Curated annotation (Swiss-Prot):
InterPro entries: Fmt (IPR005794), Formyl_trans_C (IPR005793), Formyl_trans_C_sf (IPR037022), Formyl_transf_N (IPR002376), Formyl_transf_N_sf (IPR036477), Formyl_transferase-like_C_sf (IPR011034), GART_AS (IPR001555), Met-tRNA-FMT_C (IPR044135). Pfam families: Formyl_trans_C, Formyl_trans_N. This is Methionyl-tRNA formyltransferase. Attaches a formyl group to the free amino group of methionyl-tRNA(fMet). The formyl group appears to play a dual role in the initiator identity of N-formylmethionyl-tRNA by promoting its recognition by IF2 and preventing the misappropriation of this tRNA by the elongation apparatus. It comes from Colwellia psychrerythraea (strain 34H / ATCC BAA-681) (Vibrio psychroerythus). GO terms for molecular function: methionyl-tRNA formyltransferase activity. It comes from the Bacteria. PROSITE patterns: GART. (6S)-5,6,7,8-tetrahydrofolate binds at S113, I114, L115, P116. Keywords: Protein biosynthesis, Transferase. GO terms for cellular component: cytosol. Its EC number is 2.1.2.9.
Length: 327
């Protein structure tokens, strides 16, 4: 029988809330939930609680919302919970060493990649962009480095050719909670010793998943069709891959791409040239192969299948014309 652990949970979005729900339903005790202060949201800029706070309130769990942990009073407040362990999932705040060392078993983190690959802020997006065939979650012991701590447990899943960041996020949100509970089962054993179980990361194999910037969404047709397809999938639901269409009179429109597919093309059209436009989609030449745009979004409109857009805008997508790179 597992000895229940007293846990401080720190996390913010729905992804974190799904992990918190698994802990609430486990044999362990959640002594407090930490999340950032409420933020203005919506048109009315009303202060809105994050997903983890709402779940904690629903289950009568104490909620703490420090701005950061630079304040000694906040550090002491956390220590008063006398937690066995702190679980961190998409929290968004840096933890100083005094916090990392406060719980008896330290702090563990659920990271959205198989470490040491894709350390950093955007592991899901970067794994898609790179064309990885597998990804997963790693439960690691946190240290003062960026995702450099020893690995306790990992779980893998396949990346399908149709996966987007949104669908892969859901896969990991289903994978992570089980991996987390299994990790806590290991750590709750009376004879658990990190030195006998944890595995150090090989820094030479590490890659960095830098935070996404909205400027990356601007498609450059000098990439191959395969590379562009991966970028489109990686940038859903944000920032969404985009290109600019220029009308004959010079007016520009920014269009977003929500679905596309790679096609074989062995012609010599310049990259960015429309080589086909029909109910199947708008096919654009690249440096290698062609990209068929299947679902796009016009400015101020909802995303639609290309066949529906061509009914009213066929003059925009004439075979032989060129789609511009943004900027």
């Amino acid at each position: 029988m597992v000895t229940p652990l007293n846990i401080i949970f720190a996390g913010t979005p729905e992804f974190a809330a799904q992990h918190l729900a698994a802990l609430i339903n486990s044999e362990h005790n959640i002594v407090a939930v930490y999340c950032p202060p409420d933020k203005p949201a919506g048109r009315g800029k009303k202060l809105t609680a994050c997903a983890t706070k709402l779940l904690a309130i629903e289950h009568d769990i104490i909620v703490e919302q420090p701005i950061n942990f630079k304040n000694e009073e906040d550090q002491q407040q956390l220590a008063k919970y006398n937690a066995d362990i702190m679980v961190v999932v998409a929290y968004g705040l840096l933890l100083p060493e005094v916090i990392l060392n406060s719980p008896r078993l330290g702090c563990i983190n659920v990271h959205g990649s198989i470490l040491p690959k894709w350390r950093g802020a955007a592991p899901i997006q970067r794994s898609l962009e790179a064309g990885d065939k597998k990804t997963g979650v790693t439960i690691m012991q946190m240290d003062k480095g960026l995702d450099t701590g020893d690995m306790i447990l990992s779980a893998e899943c396949e990346i399908e050719n149709t996966d987007t960041s949104a669908s892969l996020y859901e896969k990991l949100a289903n994978l992570g909670p089980t991996a987390l509970v299994n990790t806590l089962t290991i750590m709750a054993e009376p004879d658990y010793q990190a030195s006998n179980h944890n595995i150090a990361q090989d820094d030479e194999l590490a890659t960095y998943a830098k935070k996404l910037d909205k400027t990356e969404a601007e498609l450059n047709w000098q990439f191959s069709a395969d590379e562009l397809h991966r970028k489109i999938r990686a940038y859903i639901p944000w920032p969404v891959a985009q290109f600019t269409f220029t009308e004959s009179e010079g007016k520009q429109h920014r269009l977003r791409i929500w679905q596309a597919s790679v096609q074989e093309y062995r012609g010599n059209a310049d990259p960015g040239t429309i080589i086909k436009a029909d109910k199947e989609g708008i096919e654009v030449a690249t440096t290698s192969g062609s990209l068929r745009l299947e679902v796009i979004q016009l400015p101020g409109k909802k995303a639609l299948a290309v066949k529906d857009i061509l009914n009213g805008r066929s003059d925009w997508f004439v075979v032989g014309s060129t789609i511009n790179k943004l900027g």
